[in-house]
């Protein structure tokens, strides 16, 4: 997260409630990855960690971006499975029991794919165009409108640990190495509070990383 002072406490409370009410048979921990926030996000995270031992936080020394942070965050997890999501409520916590059900049924990956979105229409159009270009450029079949929100079994996280990729592109890695996966569609709600820090340049940066990933042979990254 980056400058999410209006959301971190609320998303933590929503996650705790979800586990208490729907997944009480599971143990869990909540790990926040902060990308050098300049508002009160870090202050609140430290307070939350002191208040609840199930809440953890990783404080990056600088903003490593929305590609690198989730990847390296997954590498720090130790559970039988891990779920990555944003803290602005655009990734609904209500999806988590659905992920767990698919995982219990034997799926290694469970991916949430946007069937529609209440985000800016221009950005949604650009994302759609990006996936069309992705498909033309690569022999790897992309998972359209998948942002990383989903469940990852420990066996797949171990695959990530074996990769030697300084600039990992999670969506490409999943398309290339993912197996036995399930897709669940959802309508992406609007951000609950605060403002997005993603802009056209962010999307351009992601597209550049994905192009680099696609043009490198697999054995040069492993």
Stretches with model-predicted labels:
Residues 1-120:
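Structured catalytic core of nucleotide-sugar glycosyltransferases
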Residues 60-62, 66-76, 81, 93-168, ...:
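Acceptor/aglycone-binding surface of glycosyltransferases and processive sugar-polymer synthases
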Residues 166, 172-189:
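Catalytic donor-sugar/metal-binding loop of nucleotide-sugar-dependent glycosyltransferases
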Residues 212-218:
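Conserved small/polar residues in nucleotide/adenosyl-binding loops
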């Amino acid at each position: 997260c980056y400058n999410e002072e209006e959301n971190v406490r609320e998303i933590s409370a929503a996650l705790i409630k979800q586990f208490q009410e729907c997944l009480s048979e599971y143990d869990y921990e909540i790990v926040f990855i902060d990308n050098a926030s300049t508002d009160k996000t870090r202050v609140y995270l430290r307070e939350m960690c002191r208040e609840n031992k199930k809440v953890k936080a990783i404080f990056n020394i600088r903003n490593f971006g929305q590609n690198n942070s989730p990847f390296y965050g997954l590498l720090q997890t130790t559970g039988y499975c891990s779920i990555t999501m944003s803290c602005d409520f655009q990734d609904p916590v209500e999806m988590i029991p659905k992920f767990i059900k698919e995982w219990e049924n034997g799926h290694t990956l469970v991916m949430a794919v946007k069937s529609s979105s209440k985000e800016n229409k221009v950005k949604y159009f650009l994302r759609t165009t990006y996936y069309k270009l992705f498909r033309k450029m690569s022999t790897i079949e992309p998972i359209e409108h998948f942002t990383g929100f989903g469940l990852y079994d420990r066996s797949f996280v171990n695959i990530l640990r074996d990769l030697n990729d300084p600039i990992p592109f999670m969506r490409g890695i999943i398309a290339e190495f993912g197996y036995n996966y399930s897709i669940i569609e959802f309508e992406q709600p609007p951000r609950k509070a605060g403002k997005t820090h993603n802009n056209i340049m962010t999307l351009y940066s992601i597209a550049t990383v994905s192009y680099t990933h696609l043009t490198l042979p697999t054995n040069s990254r492993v």
